[in-house]
Amino acid sequence: MGNCQAGHNLHLCLAHHPPLVCATLILLLLGLSGLGLGSFLLTHRTGLRSPDIPQDWVSFLRSFGQLTLCPRNGTVTGKWRGSHVVGLLTTLNFGDGPDRNKTRTFQATVLGSQMGLKGSSAGQLVLITARVTTERTAGTCLYFSAVPGILPSSQPPISCSEEGAGNATLSPRMGEECVSVWSHEGLVLTKLLTSEELALCGSRLLVLGSFLLLFCGLLCCVTAMCFHPRRESHWSRTRL
């Protein structure tokens, strides 16, 4: 009997208080959205990318980290006239050879396909110049020079000074000592959330979503137990 009365009270509340019903539904949807988004962030801490951007700087630089570069010798021929130059600050390691205490310049021209580019950009050339100094800096500056529309259009990583980027030169032959470029796995190259920050956001969204769902449940229980329809007065019944 009590369950029937509680259900009847809840039905009357739904019928006579539409604003309260709308507010409850909004809270319910927010709670479900928080649970869904929080679960997604906890299960997809890596690999989050916009489907509208075919190539981003993270994958671009990781492809670059698989290449091999050689020191440039003193002979210079010609100038590189790439109209689009981007200077990026990275923490790439250029090896620990005998010349690691000297300032070195590494330079290479690679096809877009070697950098993970596809379509018409795969056949375009990209000039990459890196100047490794002996100073204890926060990272290594890389200069990418190419025609417009080749380099990634996503938000760039932390940029560095572009001084000397326009003076990049091509060498007719490379030195004998080449090094492999590599980066630590999971290196954060762009201003994105780390896996720890994603986990924190996901857990907080789960807590918020659970709280909203519990609040909606508590609101329904209180309404079912305490809501009583207003009795019609004798004067109202007489007028009817």
UniProtKB/Swiss-Prot annotation:
GO terms for biological process: apoptotic process. It is found in: Cell membrane. The keyword Glycoprotein applies. GO terms for cellular component: plasma membrane. Glycans are attached at residues 73, 101, 167. Residues 39-204 are extracellular. Residues 226-240 are cytoplasmic. It holds the Pfam family TMEM219. Residues 1-38 form the signal peptide. InterPro entries: TMEM248/TMEM219, TMEM248/TMEM219_dom. It is a single-pass membrane protein. Keywords: Apoptosis, Cell membrane, Glycoprotein, Membrane, Receptor, Signal, Transmembrane, Transmembrane helix. The keyword rRNA processing does not apply. It comes from the Eukaryota. The chain crosses the membrane at residues 205-225. Widely expressed in normal tissues but suppressed in prostate and breast tumor. Cell death receptor specific for IGFBP3, may mediate caspase-8-dependent apoptosis upon ligand binding. Interacts with IGFBP3. Interacts with CASP8. This is Insulin-like growth factor-binding protein 3 receptor. The lineage of its organism: Eukaryota, Metazoa, Chordata, Craniata, Vertebrata.
